[in-house]
């Protein structure tokens, strides 16, 4: 028997974002979705690996996120890669748009999940791009932690 999913189990995670960017601050944003998109998300079908957040038209928009069509919705289905509006407080939107205009800073999608009330939420992060040296250091740290855990398991 499979174990039950927790309420905040992620539907989609952008693992590449934490490797390519240094996340300075995270925010929780709501998503303006259609009904067929919500049903598709509840099935766990979404991909935010290549998505990003853009400040345009009086708000923040999630661009290039792939939510596949929901099968039973037939002709009333949504467009898989349409732009989706993010729901944040006005002060948060102003802060993020101001910060993202600075050189080298961007807003990335980190994970997509349902909160305790069953609402679809997107965790976004204000990020700065990492240089190649930083990425190599991240790989070294990860390998060292794996090696430490193996040593502790065998000799600990």
Curated annotation (Swiss-Prot):
GO terms for biological process: trans-translation. It is found in: Cytoplasm. GO terms for cellular component: cytosol. It comes from the Bacteria. Keywords: Cytoplasm, RNA-binding. The keyword Zinc does not apply. One of its GO terms (molecular function) is RNA binding. It holds the Pfam family SmpB. InterPro entries: SmpB, SsrA-bd_prot, SsrA-bd_prot_CS. NCBIfam families: PRK05422.1, smpB. Belongs to the SmpB family. Required for rescue of stalled ribosomes mediated by trans-translation. Binds to transfer-messenger RNA (tmRNA), required for stable association of tmRNA with ribosomes. tmRNA and SmpB together mimic tRNA shape, replacing the anticodon stem-loop with SmpB. tmRNA is encoded by the ssrA gene; the 2 termini fold to resemble tRNA(Ala) and it encodes a 'tag peptide', a short internal open reading frame. During trans-translation Ala-aminoacylated tmRNA acts like a tRNA, entering the A-site of stalled ribosomes, displacing the stalled mRNA. This is SsrA-binding protein. It comes from Maricaulis maris (strain MCS10). The lineage of its organism: Bacteria, Pseudomonadati, Pseudomonadota, Alphaproteobacteria, Maricaulales.
């Amino acid at each position: 028997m499979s174990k039950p999913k927790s309420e905040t189990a992620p539907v989609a995670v952008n693992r590449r974002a934490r490797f390519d960017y240094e996340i300075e601050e995270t925010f929780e944003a709501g998503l303006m979705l259609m009904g067929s998109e919500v049903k598709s998300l509840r099935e766990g079908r979404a991909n935010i690996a290549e998505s990003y957040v853009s400040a345009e038209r009086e708000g923040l928009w999630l661009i290039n996120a792939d939510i596949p069509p929901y099968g039973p919705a037939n002709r009333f289905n949504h467009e898989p890669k349409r732009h989706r509006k993010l729901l944040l407080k006005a002060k948060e939107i102003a802060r993020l748009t101001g910060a993202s205009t600075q050189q080298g800073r961007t807003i990335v999608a980190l994970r997509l999940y349902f909160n305790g009330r069953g609402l679809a939420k997107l965790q976004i992060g204000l990020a700065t791009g990492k240089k190649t040296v930083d990425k190599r250091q991240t790989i070294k740290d990860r390998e060292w932690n794996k090696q430490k855990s193996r040593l502790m398991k065998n000799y600990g």
